[in-house]
Amino acid sequence: MLDPTFFIELLTVLRNLHAVSANSYTLVNNLRQIIIDNTATLKDLKQLIVNSRSPNSDIPTTSQSTNIIVEVEEISEKNNSNQKQRDEECNDHSDNETDEVPKKKRSQKRKFVLPPEYDENDSRWTLKHRQMAPGLVELMPHTNVYINAIKLSNCKRLSKDCKSLARLLLVEIFTKSALTICSLTGSRARAYDVEGATIRPGLDETARTVLLTYVEEYGREKGWITLDTQSIQNSIRNKMQEFRFKYG
């Protein structure tokens, strides 16, 4: 049986090695709790053995042994249950850090209301700039997809790859309400209660296509790792989900 001092020394080493890591810090705390639980278990077991050997005890040895086993099993089950709960909490924490989109149960249905500017016959209602104006430029020639020239420059300066550029351009081309309400291409809102519609409208198809084309061409110019269109679209969907959970 290992000396509890060993676990304490191991804990100290882990704390020094992983002090800057949030996940490692959680792991260390879990290990510390395991040490505490195991130490308590050892103490309880020791006390049970001492009691069973007490000359003042009138309980038969067989019965005492059975009671010890039962109590030890109960203690072990309790520790295992506590550890399982901590592991689940740790996994939830890791999921939140790994996934860019907050997780919500599907059973929690969300309602959305189409904004006043919604136009069933013209998806350009989703655009921030529907026509040329001072300070705007076309993202690509002859596409009628406009963006603020300074914002475009900032997007290119801040982006480090195709995904980050696509996400930055997304919020400069489409309105906040569109990013909150719409899906990327328009899909049935199966998990939601909907007022006034059964399908989430999609972002303007021309603008979506121009955005993706621009990102791919600019990425090649910069020598970025080439990504397939689906990967970039998934990154855009994640950004839209962020808007939906934050503002929806």
From Swiss-Prot:
GO molecular function: DNA binding
Coiled coil: none
Pfam families: BEN (PF10523)
Signal peptide: 1-22
Domain BEN: residue ranges: 142-247
Region (Disordered): 75-115
Compositionally biased residues, Basic residues: 103-112
Record flagged with keyword Manganese: no
Keyword terms: Signal
Domain of life: Viruses
PROSITE patterns from the UniProt entry: BEN (PS51457)
Ranges annotated as biased composition (Basic and acidic residues): 84-102
The protein, known as: Putative BEN domain-containing protein B1
Organism encoding this protein: Microplitis demolitor bracovirus (isolate Webb)
Recorded name of the encoding gene: B1
